[in-house]
C-alpha cells in the first residue's frame, strides 16, 4: 500500500506535500559522506550521482539493498539502511529528485566524456536503450526511469558488468538479456555516446 501511495505521489505532483523534503535533506546527510553534499556523486565506479534521480527508482534501489538484492555492505552500514523507516526513505528519494545541480552550480552538473566509438555507441543505444531512457538520455522521471546522460560513465560501466554477471537485475526482469552479448569494447562505445549527450558535452 505504501509503495502504491508513493507511485501516486510521483504521478500527481500536487500531492507531493505528503513527502517531507526538509526531512529528506536531513536524513540524506549520511549519504553525503560518499555521494557529496548535493548528491552530485564522484566520477569513479562506486559513488553515483543521486541528484535528480527519479524518486520511484531510488526507493526501489534502496529497498533492493535492504533486501540484499543488491550488495554493498559498506554503503548499507554507513547509511544505516536497516534502521531507516519507509517514510524516511520516501523523503530522501523525493529530496534527491528535487535537487537541480545545474541551478546550484553548473560545474557540479558536468559529466566527463568517455572515449570510444560514438557511432557504434549510438547504434547500440538506439537499439537497446532509447525506448526507455529517451533519445536524449534523460530518462522518464514519471515512470521512474533514470537519466543515463547524467550519470558517471565509470559507474555505468560497472553496473552493466553487474548485469552481465547476474549480480544485479535489469528492468525488473531476471531473464533480461539486453547486455548479454556486449563486449567491453561495445560497452565503452555505448558509454562514449551516452556521455556525449550530457549537458556541456553535446557538439
Regions found by a protein language model. Give the residues of each.
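The canonical Cys-X-X-Cys-His
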Residues: 29-37, 92, 121, 128-135, ...
Amino acid at each position: 500500500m505504501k509503495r502504491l501511495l508513493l507511485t501516486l505521489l510521483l504521478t500527481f505532483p500536487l500531492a507531493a506535500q505528503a513527502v517531507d523534503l526538509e526531512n529528506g535533506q536531513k536524513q540524506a546527510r549520511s549519504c553525503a559522506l560518499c555521494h557529496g553534499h548535493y548528491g552530485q556523486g564522484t566520477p569513479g565506479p562506486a559513488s553515483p550521482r543521486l541528484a535528480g534521480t527519479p524518486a520511484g527508482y531510488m526507493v526501489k534501489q534502496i529497498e533492493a539493498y535492504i533486501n540484499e538484492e543488491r550488495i554493498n555492505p559498506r554503503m548499507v552500514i554507513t547509511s544505516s539502511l536497516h534502521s531507516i523507516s519507509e517514510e524516511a526513505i520516501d523523503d530522501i528519494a523525493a529530496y534527491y529528485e528535487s535537487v537541480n545541480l545545474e541551478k546550484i552550480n553548473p560545474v557540479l552538473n558536468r559529466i566527463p566524456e568517455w572515449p570510444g566509438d560514438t557511432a557504434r555507441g549510438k547504434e547500440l543505444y538506439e537499439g537497446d536503450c532509447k525506448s526507455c531512457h529517451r533519445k536524449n538520455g534523460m530518462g522518464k522521471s514519471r515512470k521512474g526511469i533514470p537519466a543515463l546522460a547524467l550519470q558517471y560513465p565509470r559507474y555505468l560501466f560497472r553496473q552493466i558488468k553487474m548485469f552481465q554477471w547476474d549480480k544485479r537485475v535489469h528492468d525488473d526482469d531476471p531473464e533480461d538479456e539486453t547486455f548479454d552479448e556486449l563486449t567491453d569494447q561495445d560497452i565503452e562505445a555505448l558509454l562514449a555516446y551516452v556521455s556525449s549527450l550530457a549537458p556541456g558535452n553535446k557538439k
